[in-house]
């Protein structure tokens, strides 16, 4: 520890902290470091390390150009977490450039910024670094430490229970009766035990918070599973939401924890729908890829179709069987749980979830009309964003909501003082405002943000900071000629004369939203009419009571 004071220090992201931890404990075996260039390119293109071993997801350490260019081969550097705690030292062996489109297209199958990882990748540095790692200390956890188990600890627990077959279950959601049924059926199918292995690291933005989920997993394990055959362990994984490739990766990780079988369900590790409303992955694509490679990775797949509840039988059956037998069935989607039950203060039915789970979820959610949300107005300079924002704020306050208004000009004076107008500084400004907005929303406040925010990927990253449905993107649409006519400050004129550089709409592009929640054409609507249109959307979504 004394020597590290004299070494160069680099802060790494929370994603990289989680990757580092799982590298250190052997969860990513055979990997023991962030990937070098040859491994990286092989994995991206063929899902294999340079040794030929199957490994579908690149595990890399991004670095900003300014930092990467000063690194020297062979030097030792300290890797610190976002709070500046030293976690490991790395001997720099490789510094190499990466390409977002190349990686995203091959690994995720898309470059659509609605994919949460694609949006995040736009903020990574231009380089990856790799080298030998020596751990100083691993991140400490003070929540449910008894369930934060390493691969070695889980393998020892499996051995102590005398289980030669064990099926692992991955989830990032609260568990309900259907998941309980699925896992218990899987145990019977393999004739062994169960590893309940929920992810408590980085999941899909907007998922139910980790503390609520951990409480649910704990109570279900303690009250409804046979402890002689079941192990509960929390996995601090940074998910990529990479669908089929991610399913394979999850299987490799569970093999390293001692599992012999792995449950792969419908839409495994899927981030939902793209900008055009189409699913990123086919529902059973992950099962197909896993089946192809299960023998090679050394863990068998236990596939499941969607299970549905049949009232007349008082049991769950696979949906295809229910259809084949003409059975009447019911199920509740995740969206329906949130919108029709939790946010309305309605109790979830007992056929759907255990009463203890229903109680924990009820404590977490407040009625929809009391929940926080963010209205994000984006558009060209002088399109009318600030005026609409002020009118909308007044309308919401008159209806009893407390509103925070984050206007671009005001933010530049306080929150983002010192930032310029380069693309990097503009993205930083957008993400700063987005972070503040997400914290307000998290605590059930209402925030209206009025910023040019010209870059689609940055806006999508802000969207991903919030629970699904709570980021309302409003495209304040007006052609550049109209905006120029409205410009009382003469900024467009100065930009055209070359007196202002990088001005959006003149010499810097504006990327309009692909699928905004609301579009207001300010050449046809007055500011008041535009604000009313947004208000009507908020009423329709249940954020405002009539």
UniProtKB/Swiss-Prot annotation:
GO BP = hydrogen sulfide biosynthetic process; sulfate assimilation, phosphoadenylyl sulfate reduction by phosphoadenylyl-sulfate reductase (thioredoxin)
Q: Name one GO molecular function term.
A: sulfate adenylyltransferase (ATP) activity
Question: Which residues are involved in binding ATP?
Answer: 379-386
Its recorded reaction(s) are: sulfate + ATP + H(+) = adenosine 5'-phosphosulfate + diphosphate; adenosine 5'-phosphosulfate + ATP = 3'-phosphoadenylyl sulfate + ADP + H(+)
Q: Indicate whether Lipid metabolism appears among the record's keywords.
A: no
Region Adenylsulfate kinase, residue ranges: 371-546
Q: In which pathway does it act?
A: Sulfur metabolism; hydrogen sulfide biosynthesis; sulfite from sulfate: step 1/3; Sulfur metabolism; hydrogen sulfide biosynthesis; sulfite from sulfate: step 2/3
Q: What EC number(s) does this enzyme carry?
A: 2.7.7.4, 2.7.1.25
Keyword list, A-Z: ATP-binding, Kinase, Multifunctional enzyme, Nucleotide-binding, Nucleotidyltransferase, Phosphoprotein, Transferase
SUPFAM superfamilies linked to this entry: Nucleotidylyl transferase (SSF52374), P-loop containing nucleoside triphosphate hydrolases (SSF52540), PUA domain-like (SSF88697)
> What positions does UniProt annotate as the active site of this protein?
453 (phosphoserine intermediate)
Region annotated Sulfate adenylyltransferase, chain positions: 1-370
What is this protein's record name?
Probable bifunctional SAT/APS kinase
């Amino acid at each position: 520890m004394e020597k590290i004071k004299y070494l160069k220090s680099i802060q790494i992201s929370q994603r990289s902290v989680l990757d580092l931890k799982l590298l250190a404990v052997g969860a990513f075996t055979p990997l023991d470091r962030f990937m070098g260039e040859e491994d990286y390119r092989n994995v991206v293109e063929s899902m294999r390390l340079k040794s030929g071993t199957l490994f579908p997801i690149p595990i890399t350490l991004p670095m900003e150009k300014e930092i990467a260019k000063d690194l020297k081969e062979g030097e030792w550097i300290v890797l610190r977490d976002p709070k500046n705690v030293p976690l490991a030292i790395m001997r720099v062996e490789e510094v190499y450039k990466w390409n977002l489109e190349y990686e995203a297209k091959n690994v995720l199958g898309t470059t659509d910024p609605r994919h949460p990882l694609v949006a995040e990748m736009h903020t990574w540095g231009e380089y990856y670094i790799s080298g030998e790692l020596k751990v100083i200390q691993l991140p400490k956890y003070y929540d449910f430490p008894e369930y934060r188990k390493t691969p070695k600890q889980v393998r020892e627990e499996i051995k102590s229970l005398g289980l030669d077959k064990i099926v692992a279950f991955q989830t990032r959601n609260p568990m309900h009766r259907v998941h309980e049924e699925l896992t218990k059926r899987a145990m019977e199918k393999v004739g062994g035990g169960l590893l309940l292995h929920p992810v408590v690291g980085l999941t899909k933005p907007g998922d139910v918070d980790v503390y609520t989920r951990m409480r649910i997993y704990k109570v279900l394990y303690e009250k409804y599973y046979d402890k002689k055959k079941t192990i509960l362990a929390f996995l601090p994984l940074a998910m990529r939401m990479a669908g089929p490739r991610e399913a394979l990766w999850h299987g490799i990780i569970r093999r390293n924890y001692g599992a012999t079988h792995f449950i792969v369900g419908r839409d495994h590790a899927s981030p939902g729908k793209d900008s055009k409303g189409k699913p990123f992955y086919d529902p059973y694509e992950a099962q197909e890829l896993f089946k192809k490679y299960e023998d090679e990775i050394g863990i068998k797949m236990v596939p499941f179709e969607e299970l549905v509840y049949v009232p007349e039988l008082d049991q769950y059956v696979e949906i295809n069987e229910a259809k084949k037998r003409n059975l009447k069935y019911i199920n509740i989607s995740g969206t329906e749980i949130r919108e029709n039950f939790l946010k309305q203060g309605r109790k979830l039915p007992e056929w759907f979830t255990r009463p203890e789970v229903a109680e924990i979820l009820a404590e977490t959610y407040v009625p929809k009309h009391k929940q926080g949300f963010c209205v994000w107005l984006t558009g060209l300079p002088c399109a009318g964003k600030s005026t609409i924002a002020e009118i909308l704020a007044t309308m919401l306050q008159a209806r009893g909501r407390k509103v925070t208004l984050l206007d671009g000009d005001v933010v530049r004076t306080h929150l983002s003082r010192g930032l310029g107008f380069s693309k990097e500084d503009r993205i930083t400004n957008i993400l700063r405002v987005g972070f503040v907005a997400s914290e307000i929303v998290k605590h059930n406040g209402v925030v209206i943000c009025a910023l040019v925010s010209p870059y689609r990927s940055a806006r999508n990253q802000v969207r991903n900071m919030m629970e699904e449905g709570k980021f309302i993107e409003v495209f304040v649409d007006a052609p550049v000629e109209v905006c120029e006519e409205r410009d009382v400050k003469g900024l467009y004129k100065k930009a055209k004369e070359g007196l202002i550089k990088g001005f959006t709409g003149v010499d810097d592009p504006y990327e309009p939203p692909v699928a905004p929640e609301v579009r207001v054409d300010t050449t046809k609507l007055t500011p008041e009419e535009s604000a009313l249109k947004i208000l009507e959307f908020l009423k329709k979504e249940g954020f405002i009571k009539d």
